[in-house]
Each structure stands twice: as structure tokens, then as C-alpha cells.
């Protein structure tokens, strides 16, 4: 059942996937559902809803990524980083979260599913000082745009950008962007079977 749904959703967003990638995505849902019972990683309890709200909600960003090296801040159980890493094996993803149980889950997922282009780091974002900066800084359900930019300003490389995954856009939030940053693009995203607004904001340091 889940397999057929995934197939249909990927076709709907026009995202080609190999048999191995589809298996990894479904296995990720299975592990998230299993671990969630003990670790409370997400409020979503139904695997079919996980597929929409977590997997597809992450993957609609995939074709908009520019660059090779990304960091997912406040990643939680690895969203959107793990689904994006599965679908973009040529790119590398660092998953950053301050909670150890989430990091342990991410590492187990990467090990069991054979995902070799992710690494997980337990740290608060403002305390994390990478040796190499990033082409893209991803945030989903992490913080307000203002706080995200304030805390993550040191993470992008010279020509890197921020990718803020948001629901409904708030005029107040959009108007309170810190000095020195600019929104370059606002993209309306359509997530299969999700009747809610989704947007991707691309932001650069000026």
C-alpha cells in the first residue's frame, strides 16, 4: 500500500527515483514509525501520514537545491535532510540537532539503510563551527526566519544561501528579516495529498 502511494506521489511531483531509493524512503518511514513509539520523534503516528507530511513535504524541495554541500539545522529525526540525501546521492548533508535521541536515530537510519552522504552532529546551531561552510542551509519547522538567520548566519559559504521551508507566510515574519539578508525567491510548493500552504524561501547574505 505505502509503496504504491509513494510511487504515485513521486510521479505527481515529477521526481524520478530508483528502486533502491524508493526502498530507502519506505524503510525510513518504517524506522521512524518503530522508533517513534519509544523516542517520541514526531507527533505523526500513522505511516501513511508520515509519507505525506514528512517524506513528500521534504522532497518537494529537492529540485530547488543548488550546490553540493548542505546543512539541515534543527533536523529533528532527519527532516528534510535524510529524504533529500536519499534522492541526491551526489550531494552531502550534515544533520544538526541538539537532542541526543534524535542524533542516535539518524545514525541508525544511515547505518541500516546504507546512506553514505549524511553525517549527524549533536550541537546547538549557534555553537556549531564547521571547518567547511555550506552551499545551502536548510531549515524546516525550526524557528522564525529572523531567528534562523540570526543563529545560522555563520554557516553558508561565500555564495551559499538559506532555504527556509515554511507553511503559510506571515507578513510580520517577512518584514522582520535581519539587516544584511535578502529574500531572492519565494516558491509555492505543492505537496501531494496535503491541503495546506507550503513555501520555500531562498535567502542570501548581502
Swiss-Prot record:
Family recorded in the similarity comment: Belongs to the methyltransferase superfamily. RNA methyltransferase RsmG family.
Q: Which UniProt keywords apply?
A: Cytoplasm, Methyltransferase, rRNA processing, S-adenosyl-L-methionine, Transferase
Q: Which reaction does it catalyse?
A: guanosine(527) in 16S rRNA + S-adenosyl-L-methionine = N(7)-methylguanosine(527) in 16S rRNA + S-adenosyl-L-homocysteine
Give GO cellular component annotations, separated by semicolons.
cytosol
The protein's organism comes out as Shewanella oneidensis (strain ATCC 700550 / JCM 31522 / CIP 106686 / LMG 19005 / NCIMB 14063 / MR-1)
Q: Please give the function described in this protein's UniProt entry.
A: Specifically methylates the N7 position of guanine in position 527 of 16S rRNA.
From the Swiss-Prot or TrEMBL record, give the protein name. Ribosomal RNA small subunit methyltransferase G
Q: Could you name the domain of life of the organism this protein comes from?
A: Bacteria
Give its localization: Cytoplasm
Q: What is its EC number?
A: 2.1.1.170
PANTHER family recorded? S-ADENOSYL-L-METHIONINE-DEPENDENT METHYLTRANSFERASES SUPERFAMILY PROTEIN
Where does this protein chiefly localize? Answer: cytoplasm
Q: Which residues bind S-adenosyl-L-methionine?
A: 74, 79, 125-126, 140
Gene3D superfamilies noted in UniProt? Vaccinia Virus protein VP39
Instruction: State the Pfam families in the record.
Output: GidB
Identify the InterPro entries for this entry. Answer: rRNA_ssu_MeTfrase_G, SAM-dependent_MTases_sf
| One MF annotation (Gene Ontology) recorded for this entry | rRNA (guanine-N7-)-methyltransferase activity
